[in-house]
Structures are given as structure tokens and as C-alpha cells.
């Protein structure tokens, strides 16, 4: 009997690996060629006589009503020039990132065949960490000043924010921005809706960034992932006992969904926990749903939170 079970297990692994190989070959064969436009470099190296040409080629970066002197002053500003120097030092060779972008968009096109490869432009902006990457149907804009490394001298931010100012966070941030075009915004305050929304976003990263670690996908440290895994059952019991899954209390979003140094159970474990544990748990629910239901990704993204949760058969690991 044990021999039969062993043979079945081996066959299952073999079939799974063969299917994965076929899928990967199909993804690799998708033609994607990305040309990254280094607007940051063009802007800070332009001359007054060439500024008009730059404005013509990139009108969306030059709001009407501003005199050329505004842009020339920025180009010559010592602080902006120092920031540009640091970005150029880090990203003088952008080819590795370009290759990663091409790999990512092969995965995107495999799962979403109608998606067109956008025009990719890098910029240096105002360190708006809530908009590190902006994705539209035709444009992908990446703010390079927010990927210099968490210990960079320019970053005067709390650790829980600047820990994701690493180059390895660039592709996960692209997927986060891409997901905004695919996911309908949450229209209610129910905690479960928020959890499943971000769970879907993270599941997209499972599909589109298969070689990335869970820590990189969600923007945690490995230790924070370990904490969530070890306390999954405890957190889930807390959510059930406090009856907050279906609650519309707006405070829950700040306690368990939004960026924060830690999550707020109002218990001793708070200081040990990472922020956003609700998004991590929503991820596990969506993963469980996809494991137990044969649903295309486009359909998953349209489904409501209650249906996903009820059909997920989610049980935290002991």
C-alpha cells in the first residue's frame, strides 16, 4: 500500500513539474522588448537651449503655466543635483532592471493577453513613497530616488517605510500599481473586503513574480514573514473571537491594513508584530481559495470578498 502511495506521489510531482515547465516555456516565448527612457538623466543633463525639445517629448512632466526658469532652477539646484548624482551612481547601468521588467511583462502578457507593453520612463521626483510607481495603460513611471537602499543618507523616514526603498522592491511595486487597473476599488469599510482586496493583489505577485520571496512580495523582512506564519492561528482566532471580519469600523483599516510599524491587537504581541497583518491573512485566504477552486485569474479579481472567503476553505496552519 505504501509503495502505491509513493508511486502516486512521484507521478503527481512529475506531472506538476512537467506542467510548470510547459507554462514557463510558453511565458519565455512571449516577445517583449522594453526600452527604458531615462527622463531623470535627460532632465538633469539638458541645457537651456534643449529644454524646449524635452518639454515637447515629455509634455506630461511639464504643467502649463510654469516658466522655463522654474525648470532651469531645479536642474541647477544643488540638492536636486546631489540626488541625481546618487541615482546615477546606483543606476548608471539600468540593463538588469530592464531585463527584470521584460520578464515581468512576459508573465503579465501570459496571464492578461490584452495588456500592451507600456512606455517605461524613470524619473526623480519628490520622494512620494505612496506613489513610487505609477502605471497607466500606456505609461509606467518609476521614481528611482526611492530605490537607493534603506540605509541611504537621504532617507529621513521611519524604518517600516524605508525598509522597502530597495531595488528588489521595484518589481513588486510595479505589480502593485498594475493591480490598480485590474482590481475594482473596495466600496465598503468591511475589514474582510480590505483583506481580500490586498490578498488578490499579493496573489497577483505570486503569479507574476514567481521567483520572488514572500517577504519581497509583501515588503516584509524574512523575520516578519516568520512571525506571521508562527502566529497565523493565533491571529485568526483573535479576528473570529472579536468578530471583526465583517465589521465596518473604520479604525480596523489603520490597525491591520495600512502601513504601520506594527499591527494593533492592543495586546503584548503588538510590538513584535509587523504592520498590515490583515493583508497577509487576506493573501492566505486567496491562496486557499485558488488551491480549492478552478477559477481563471480574471474571474478571481472580479469576485466579491464574501464569496472568496466562503469558498476558500481557509484554515490557518497550526
Residue ranges and their predicted role:
Residues 36, 102-105, 201, 205, ...:
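Extracytoplasmic/secreted envelope proteins and their assembly/folding machinery
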Residues 203-265:
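Acidic/His/Gly-enriched intrinsically disordered linker/tail segments
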Residues 78-228, 298, 302-305:
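Acidic/His-rich structured neighborhood in mature extracellular/periplasmic domains
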Residues 13-16:
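C-terminal motif of bacterial Sec signal peptides marking the signal peptidase cleavage site
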Residues 18-84:
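N-terminal mature-domain "stem" immediately C-terminal to a signal peptide or N-terminal signal-anchor/transmembrane
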Residues 1-4, 19:
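Positively charged n-region of N-terminal signal peptides that target proteins for export
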Amino acid at each position: 500500500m505504501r509503495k502505491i502511495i509513493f508511486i502516486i506521489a512521484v507521478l503527481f510531482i512529475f506531472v506538476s513539474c512537467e506542467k510548470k515547465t510547459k507554462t514557463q516555456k510558453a511565458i519565455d516565448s512571449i516577445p517583449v522588448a522594453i526600452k527604458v527612457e531615462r527622463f531623470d538623466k535627460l532632465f538633469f543633463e539638458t541645457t537651456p537651449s534643449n529644454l524646449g525639445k524635452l518639454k515637447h517629448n515629455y509634455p506630461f512632466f511639464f504643467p502649463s503655466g510654469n516658466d522655463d526658469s522654474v525648470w532651469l532652477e531645479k536642474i541647477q539646484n544643488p540638492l536636486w543635483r546631489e540626488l541625481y548624482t546618487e541615482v546615477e551612481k546606483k543606476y548608471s547601468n539600468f540593463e538588469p532592471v530592464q531585463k527584470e521588467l521584460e520578464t515581468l511583462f512576459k508573465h503579465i502578457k501570459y496571464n492578461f493577453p490584452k495588456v500592451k507593453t507600456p512606455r517605461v520612463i524613470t524619473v526623480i521626483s519628490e520622494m512620494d513613497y505612496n506613489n513610487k510607481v505609477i502605471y497607466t495603460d500606456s505609461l509606467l513611471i518609476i521614481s528611482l530616488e526611492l530605490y537607493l537602499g534603506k540605509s541611504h543618507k537621504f532617507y529621513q523616514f521611519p524604518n517600516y517605510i524605508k525598509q522597502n526603498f530597495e531595488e528588489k522592491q521595484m518589481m513588486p511595486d510595479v505589480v502593485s500599481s498594475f493591480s490598480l487597473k485590474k482590481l475594482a476599488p473596495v466600496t465598503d469599510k468591511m475589514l474582510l473586503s480590505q483583506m481580500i482586496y490586498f490578498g488578490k493583489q499579493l496573489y497577483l505577485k505570486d503569479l507574476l513574480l514567481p521567483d520572488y520571496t514572500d517577504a519581497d512580495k509583501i515588503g516584509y523582512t524574512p523575520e516578519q514573514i516568520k512571525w506571521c506564519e508562527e502566529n497565523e492561528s493565533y491571529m485568526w482566532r483573535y479576528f473570529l473571537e472579536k468578530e471583526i471580519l465583517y465589521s465596518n469600523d473604520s479604525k480596523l483599516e489603520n490597525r491591520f491594513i495600512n502601513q504601520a510599524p506594527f499591527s494593533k491587537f492592543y495586546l503584548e504581541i503588538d510590538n513584535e508584530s509587523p504592520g498590515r497583518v490583515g493583508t497577509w491573512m487576506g493573501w492566505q485566504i486567496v491562496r486557499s481559495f485558488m488551491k480549492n477552486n478552478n477559477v481563471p485569474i480574471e474571474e478571481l479579481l472580479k469576485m466579491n470578498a464574501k464569496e472568496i472567503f466562503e469558498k476558500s476553505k481557509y484554515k490557518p496552519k497550526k
